[in-house]
A protein has these predicted regions:
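Positively charged n-region of N-terminal signal peptides that target proteins for export
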Residues: 1-4
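Exposed beta-sheet edge and beta->alpha loop/turn motif
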Residues: 97-177
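Bacterial N-terminal signal peptides
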Residues: 7-17
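Compositionally biased, proline/threonine/alanine/serine-rich low-complexity intrinsically disordered stretches
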Residues: 17-29, 73, 167-177
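Short, low-complexity N-terminal intrinsically disordered segments enriched in polar/charged residues
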Residues: 19-43, 47
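Short solvent-exposed beta->alpha transition segments
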Residues: 29, 35, 51-108
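Alpha-helix boundary/capping and short turn/kink residues
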Residues: 47-50, 120
Length: 177
């Protein structure tokens, strides 16, 4: 009887599907998919198309913004404001994703990105990253734009409180050319 109960207790976490995330390497397939998705989102942003960004944003940011509709409205308004201010994207490039980090039942990795842009005729280089997040055991990634985290690193922990300790953000910034 005791062995039966012990086996049941050991099997219970598996039945509940509460597998915690483990830090590790990004597979070549995941790396290619991440780069492709980030490139597609950056391309949409450059064209003024916000729908892919809105659809692929991690729920934690939508919640922080006041919900899905509030986030969608803010994203559309931001893209319009940037265009009105004379910001145009010349080119974008998604880099090779780094390792993964545990975040409770999710895993996280950073995807570097570099953009050349023009701000009222002044060329600039933006170096930043996207934070890719997915539930362990799934293939669909959701994203957070890391640009806001460069000036506010605490935002990462606010959005992903279960993220393993000691994770440092990639470097980034703006540079006039």
């Amino acid at each position: 009887m005791h062995r039966y109960l012990l086996a049941l207790l050991l099997a219970l976490p598996m039945a509940m599907d509460v597998t915690p995330a483990l830090a590790g390497e990004v597979s070549p397939e995941d790396s290619a998919a991440l780069r492709k998705e980030v490139q597609a989102m950056m391309g949409g942003f450059a064209r003024g198309d916000t729908e892919l960004i809105i659809a692929r944003t991690h729920p934690s940011l939508k919640q922080l913004a006041g919900g899905d509709e509030a986030y969608a409205r803010a994203t559309r308004d931001t893209v319009k404001a940037l265009r009105k201010a004379g910001v145009t994207i010349i080119s974008d490039e998604a880099g090779v994703p780094g390792r993964t980090y545990a975040a409770g039942d999710e895993e996280v990795c950073f995807v570097p990105r570099q953009s050349l842009l023009r701000v009222r005729e002044a060329p600039m280089r933006s170096t930043s990253f996207m934070v890719a997040v997915r539930r362990v055991g799934t293939t669909q990634w959701r994203y957070l734009d890391g640009a806001a985290m460069l000036d506010n690193p605490a935002l990462l922990r606010q959005l992903l409180p279960a993220l393993e300790p000691g994770v440092t953000l990639p470097r980034g910034g703006m540079e006039a050319l």
